[in-house]
């Protein structure tokens, strides 16, 4: 299977999961969750879904993680309705720390600029 297909499937899953989270999942724990990236396994059996949440509070992050785990079945079922694939991949949710890392770098650069 070519990388183009894997990338396209990952992009489609990202788009659909974002839409499902905002329109179909009513759990308040996942209301601020945004999907940032989806990485597919080579055989399309597993999709690692990276997410971010607006809140920096550890309790909100933990609630979002629990909410996503509880909603995985619903999300997968809705993906099955939307995608034309033989088998819908298993979803593994993982927090994306790249945005927090980028914000920290921005803050450090601003502090450096103030010192000069």
Curated annotation (Swiss-Prot):
For molecular function, the Gene Ontology terms on record are: ribosomal small subunit binding
GO cellular component terms attached to this protein's record: cytosol
This protein's superkingdom? Bacteria
Which keywords fit this entry according to its UniProt record? Answer: Cytoplasm, Ribosome biogenesis
Q: What is its main location?
A: cytoplasm
Asked if the Swiss-Prot or TrEMBL record annotates the protein with the keyword Cytoplasm, the reply is yes
Q: Where does this polypeptide localize?
A: Cytoplasm
- Quaternary structure? Monomer. Binds 30S ribosomal subunits, but not 50S ribosomal subunits or 70S ribosomes.
Q: Provide the protein name.
A: Ribosome-binding factor A
* Organism listed in the record: Streptococcus equi subsp. zooepidemicus (strain MGCS10565)
What is the organism lineage in this UniProt record? Bacteria, Bacillati, Bacillota, Bacilli, Lactobacillales
The gene behind this protein is rbfA
